[in-house]
Structure formats: C-alpha cells, structure tokens
C-alpha cells in the first residue's frame, strides 16, 4: 500500500467514526463495512475533539452577548444535536438496567428496552444539570478555560470509554447490535492512536491540570471497569455511552477544582 493510499484509508476511517458517533453526514465516497467500523475505534477521540470544538465555538461566539448559563446551554445543545443524544441515551439505558435488574441477564434485557425508566430519567436529568452547573462555574471563572474544558472533556471522555473495547468483554450476543463490529479484535496500533489523541489534547492545559486530569481518568477508568464487570460481566454499547458521560462530568469537575486552586 502506497503512502497516499494509506492516508486515504485513515481519512476513510475517521469519517466512518464520525458517521457512527455523530449526525454529521459522511462524504458519499466513504464506504462503510464492519471491518472499517472495527478499525475506526482509533479515531473516536478525534470525533470527540470535533464535537467539543464545535460546542466551544458556539459558547465563545455567544458568551459576550448572552448570560453564561444561556451560552453554556447552547453549547450543550450543540453537542446533543451533533451526536443525536447518542451517549445520553446509553447513559439512561445503563442506569435503567443496573437499577432495575437483579441478574446480568435482567439488566441486559432492560437496557435493550427502548422505553425510558425512572432510573434512566433521573440519571439523565442529574447528569445534564450537573454538566450545566459545572460549565457555568467554569465560564464565570474564565470563558477561555470553559471552552477549552469542553474540547478536552469531549475528547478525553471518549478516549476512556473507547479504551474499554480493548480490554473488556462484549456481553451482548445480539447480531443486530450496532456495537457488535466494535467488539471484534482491536490492534495495538488502534489503541496507540486512540490514547495519543487523548494525551495530545491535554497539552492545551497547564501542567498540573493535565497531570491531575490524567491521573483521575486512569483511576476512574479502573472504577468503571470494576462496576461494569460486577453488574454485567463486561460492556455493551450503552455502557460505553454511560462511561463517556460520566468521564465528561468528572473532567469538568477536576478542571474546576484545579482551576480554583491555580
């Protein structure tokens, strides 16, 4: 494979990842298949970077004319519209399953139900409110920091969530599952590119903030793994969405605390 063909392949994989995780239309020349979707996991962090950047731009464009709370709300709405609420849906399904089921089989069955239950609704409301409040506090502290936090959090949270694919067991055996292709064997190159995107985006932060966030994310990932293994024995597409949302919230919390210290 020539260097040009290799670059074209990587661009294809990025667009496949973008098409899977967002509502942004892929170029018509991009062909999607299970193998490409499997390899596209390496670019999930960059998709988060794109979503975070667009959300931050909306915030920065409006924060001089609108109250901080409204600008933050518009940035959150931008992220939700870009992804179609993909991760929020996974969060709600995960909490419905974990909260309403006794056995792993019960939990997986409930998570597959498209109806929203009380556990999922409460989790969704609390996460959105907490995200809004944390971002408003960051915006009042420094609008530049708030926008940068959006970019970092959207990227890093997706890197952590996607990294579960490489180490954990996919526990849903439904062949119609949209996440099934992602559950196939992942190569070390895929993991390296994924992690690199998360590490590189940390460069926009100050040293202590970047180090603090990195250490917290490592610890949080371990905690998420323990919980998922105890609850259902591994992961599903829904739990990856839940992991992303939880990690995003924690990113904002860490940056707010560290920002207050600095």
From Swiss-Prot:
Reactions that this protein is recorded to catalyse: alpha-ribazole + adenosylcob(III)inamide-GDP = adenosylcob(III)alamin + GMP + H(+); alpha-ribazole 5'-phosphate + adenosylcob(III)inamide-GDP = adenosylcob(III)alamin 5'-phosphate + GMP + H(+)
EC number of the protein: 2.7.8.26
Cofactor field: Mg(2+)
A Pfam family reported for this protein in Swiss-Prot or TrEMBL: CobS
Keywords annotated in UniProt: Cell inner membrane, Cell membrane, Cobalamin biosynthesis, Magnesium, Membrane, Transferase, Transmembrane, Transmembrane helix
Top EC group: transferase
Ranges that cross the membrane: 43-63, 66-86, 120-140, 146-166, 191-211, 242-262
GO molecular-function term, one example from the UniProt record: adenosylcobinamide-GDP ribazoletransferase activity
Protein's job: Joins adenosylcobinamide-GDP and alpha-ribazole to generate adenosylcobalamin (Ado-cobalamin). Also synthesizes adenosylcobalamin 5'-phosphate from adenosylcobinamide-GDP and alpha-ribazole 5'-phosphate.
Protein name: Adenosylcobinamide-GDP ribazoletransferase
Gene coding for it: cobS
């Amino acid at each position: 494979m020539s260097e040009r063909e290799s670059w074209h392949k990587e661009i294809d994989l990025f667009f496949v990842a973008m098409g899977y995780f967002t509502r942004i239309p892929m170029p018509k020349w991009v062909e999607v298949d299970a193998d490409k979707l499997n390899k596209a996991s390496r670019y999930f962090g960059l998709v988060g970077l794109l979503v975070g950047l667009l959300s931050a731009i909306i915030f920065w464009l409006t924060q001089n004319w609108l109250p901080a709370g409204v600008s933050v709300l518009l940035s959150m709405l931008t992220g939700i519209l870009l992804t179609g609420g993909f991760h929020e849906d996974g969060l709600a399904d995960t909490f419905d399953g974990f909260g309403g089921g006794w056995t792993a089989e019960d939990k997986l069955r409930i998570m597959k139900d498209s109806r929203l239950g009380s556990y999922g609704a409460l989790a969704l409301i609390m996460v959105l409110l907490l995200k809004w409040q944390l971002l408003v506090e960051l915006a009042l502290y420094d609008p530049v920091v708030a926008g940068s936090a959006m970019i970092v959090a959207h990227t890093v949270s997706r890197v952590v969530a996607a990294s579960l694919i490489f180490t954990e067991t996919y526990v849903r055996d439904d062949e119609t599952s949209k996440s099934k292709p992602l559950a196939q064997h992942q190569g070390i190159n895929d993991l390296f590119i994924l992690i690199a995107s998360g590490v590189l985006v940390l460069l926009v932060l100050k040293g202590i903030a970047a180090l603090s966030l990195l250490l917290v994310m490592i610890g949080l990932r371990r905690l998420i793994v323990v919980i998922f293994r105890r609850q259902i024995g591994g992961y599903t597409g829904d739990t990856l969405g839940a992991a992303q949302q939880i990690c995003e919230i924690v990113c904002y919390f860490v940056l707010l605390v560290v920002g207050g210290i600095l």
